[in-house]
Structure formats: structure tokens, C-alpha cells
Design a protein with these regions (language model features):
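Conserved ABC ATPase signature
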Residues: 71-75
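H-loop/switch region of ABC-family ATPase nucleotide-binding domains
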Residues: 131-132
């Protein structure tokens, strides 16, 4: 909404922004799923009768409603990741920041969690991801910002970033191998080739 957050307190920012850590085991602190998702609301002093419907809604969105009364220890790593996301969604943030959302996951769980985040984004939640996974960046992010030495050096689509040799070099990134292929075989506009390839891949395997 174009708001400058510099003048806001941490408490004020926390009502707008949710943060999900890379490892859910470092974030989860309650043994039961319901209590974990309800924790933030209880800390804010929300009445118990108001908490349950908010928790139920967050669990439903995250596909965890059947596990409401389960212990967290019974879940897979990917499901635990969703519990941490649900705990943030229960607080109704406008922006969700995720640190390496697919770290340590196989292709199946990688796809599952990214498709889930894509759906959340389509429902109106702004998603910001911190990632070193360049394929994920190409496949799922319409917009990318590159930071090097504490300064923003790139602000464009993921395809434009990863087909820009100057930005990639300054940030110690590699241009995508698709870009290298396009250059090698003499394609006039490598960025268009890369985008078309990614679009085709998504259409084929989803």
C-alpha cells in the first residue's frame, strides 16, 4: 500500500508482517498443532472463543484441518513447515516472509509447498521469499530483488535478473544454463527463450 515502515514500532509491523523461518523445528515451540497455531493469538490477548475459528481457518487453508488435535511430532517436515505458515496466517498478516521455503525438501514436497504458496498469493497474501535456489526463483517468482553487500543492485523479473550477466557477476550468481544455451545457439532474445521454457515446463509437469 506504499506505507513507509521506518516510523512504525516492531509491534506495529508485526500486525502487518509474518515471518516463517527456514527450519520449522527452530520455530515450533508447542507440542500440539492447535496450541502452536493459537500461540500468537493468545500472546496478543485474543479471547479464547475468537481464537478457535481463526485457528480453524488457518489450518483449513494450509490443508491441516484433519490434524488439528495431533501432536506436531507426528508430522512430516513439509507438514511442520505448513504449521509454521498456519501460525502466521492465523494472525492475518498482509505480507508473509519465508526464509528458504523449500530447503531440505525433495521434489515432491518442493512442488507441494510452492504450489500452496502460489495459491496463498492468489488469495491476496503478498509472499516474499529469501532464496538461493535459482530454479525456484525462475519457476515461481514474477519479481526478484538482488542484494549484494547490503545494496540493491537488481529489481526486475526473475528471468531478467538471471539473464543479466552484469547483475549476476556483481552478486556472485550464475546466469541460468538456459541463458547460456540460448547464447550458444544464437537465439536473438535469450530472456524470451528462458521464459518460454519455464512456462512450458510448468505446463508439462503440473
Amino acid at each position: 500500500k506504499g506505507q513507509d515502515l521506518k516510523g512504525q514500532t516492531i509491534k506495529e509491523r508485526s500486525h502487518l508482517i509474518g515471518f516463517v523461518m527456514q527450519n520449522p523445528n527452530q520455530m515450533i515451540c508447542k507440542p500440539m498443532i492447535y496450541d502452536e497455531v493459537a500461540l500468537g493469538l493468545r500472546i496478543r490477548g485474543v479471547a479464547e472463543e475468537e481464537i478457535e475459528p481463526k485457528v480453524d481457518k488457518a489450518l483449513q487453508i494450509c490443508g491441516l484441518a484433519p490434524f488439528k488435535k495431533w501432536p506436531v511430532s507426528a508430522l512430516s517436515f513439509g507438514q511442520k513447515k505448513r504449521v509454521t505458515i498456519a501460525s502466521m496466517l492465523a494472525l492475518d498478516p498482509k505480507v508473509l516472509i519465508l526464509d528458504e521455503p523449500t530447503a531440505g525438501q525433495d521434489y515432491h514436497h518442493y512442488t507441494e509447498i510452492m504450489e500452496f504458496l502460489k495459491k496463498l498469493n492468489e488469495e491476496g497474501v503478498t509472499i516474499i521469499m529469501i532464496t538461493h535456489d535459482m530454479h525456484l526463483m525462475l519457476e515461481y517468482t514474477p519479481h526478484a530483488i538482488v542484494i549484494s553487500d547490503g545494496k540493491k543492485i537488481g529489481d526486475a523479473s526473475a528471468v531478467e535478473i538471471l539473464t543479466n550477466e552484469e547483475i549476476a557477476g556483481r552478486a556472485n550468481l550464475k546466469t541460468t544454463s538456459l541463458y547460456d544455451l540460448a547464447v550458444k545457439i544464437g537465439i536473438e532474445d535469450p530472456s524470451v527463450f528462458v521464459q518460454n521454457f519455464i512456462d512450458y515446463e510448468r505446463g508439462t509437469y503440473r
